């Protein structure tokens, strides 16, 4: 059976950075990002901040669970893709064929018990709030077409509250907590070595 490694943490904590670095070392691992399971806002004009992207209900949780369950059963899936500029799901999907170990990353992947039960190793990236905010600000402005004002307003109105209400409490479910995500070379080396061994030797660790 496929082993699923979950990497969670607040927005800007360094999840994607760690995953990208792991992928450079171990390219045979498949990555599934929870970001692709955001619900479409719709094809109409709206006030962006009326949509709370920092709440579990912002995700298509049923689809996320069903597809992870298929991955766990070594079945291929067609993963959705999300357009963060237009805030809707794209028409195209990506075919994902499971590898022995699959990495799943996202801010709320530990929120639902049914999803947690599918994850064999739970990793939480614990990064200071100011660092996370700066990273989120840079990312949203450079890659998601956001303005400085909109990012700050969203952070103050929903992101900060969502982190303390939904994300930080899931730290208690983690098997491993990594501080300073994305810039912790020692932790990255240990994690990469472990995943490489796991991919070769299978389920001996679980």
Swiss-Prot record:
It is found in: Cytoplasm. It holds the Pfam family PRK. ATP binds at residues 9-16. The gene is udk. It comes from Borrelia hermsii (strain HS1 / DAH). One of its GO terms (molecular function) is ATP binding. GO terms for biological process: CTP salvage; UMP salvage. Keywords: ATP-binding, Cytoplasm, Kinase, Nucleotide-binding, Transferase. SUPFAM superfamilies: P-loop containing nucleoside triphosphate hydrolases. This is Uridine kinase. Transmembrane segments: none annotated. The keyword Disulfide bond does not apply. One of its GO terms (cellular component) is cytoplasm. It is an enzyme of class 2 (transferase). InterPro entries: P-loop_NTPase, PRK/URK, Uridine_kinase, Uridine_kinase-like. Its main location: cytoplasm. Pathway: Pyrimidine metabolism; CTP biosynthesis via salvage pathway; CTP from cytidine: step 1/3; Pyrimidine metabolism; UMP biosynthesis via salvage pathway; UMP from uridine: step 1/1. It catalyses: uridine + ATP = UMP + ADP + H(+); cytidine + ATP = CMP + ADP + H(+). Belongs to the uridine kinase family.
